[in-house]
Amino acid sequence: MTNSSGRRRPDVTTVEIIGGPEALEIGLSDYDARWAETYLRHRRRILDALGADVDVEHIGSTSVPGLAAKPIVDIVVAVADITSEEDYLDALLAAGYELRVREPGHRLVRTPGRDVHVHVYERGAAAVHEYLLFRDHLRADADDRALYENVKRALFEQPWNDMNDYSDAKSDVILAIKSRAGAARR
């Protein structure tokens, strides 16, 4: 049974970070073509676990050839109903992923080795569009790719007590690049 939004139940209203804050203990690596291979292996694992009725894309810096990145492969999965965790979460946990974040509209599971992060959103979520817009623009625009890498390298010169703080520090440059990416698509 679904409600008027088409969901089975209301979504969570708070952010739950399982395990608490974690220090950022890794640095940037030059682009490694094996990241694409890692993505393909995990794409297959996700599809085997969830079936074909999900969208799976490689996102983040490891999805952009030539871009330095933290050696963590980011994947986005779009499901029919984010609130119906029974349709995807148990299967992802059984496939070897661990739940790290549960927040409104988003779940994050990752490998125990923390080298693959799987972001789960509802199909049609704005965040999925934003991830793909950013990825595709960086793949096509060498100047913005270089700008983004330079900002990341500068940020890695300082210590970070929490990986989320490092991500937040990139927000301004990401917003500027996404603005240019959106304008280029019009």
Curated annotation (Swiss-Prot):
Signal peptide location: none
Lineage top rank: taxon: Bacteria
Stored Gene3D superfamilies: Beta Polymerase, domain 2
Name of the protein this chain belongs to: UPF0157 protein SCO7215
InterPro entries: GrpB/CoaE (IPR007344), NT_sf (IPR043519)
Family: Belongs to the UPF0157 (GrpB) family.
Pfam families, per the entry: GrpB
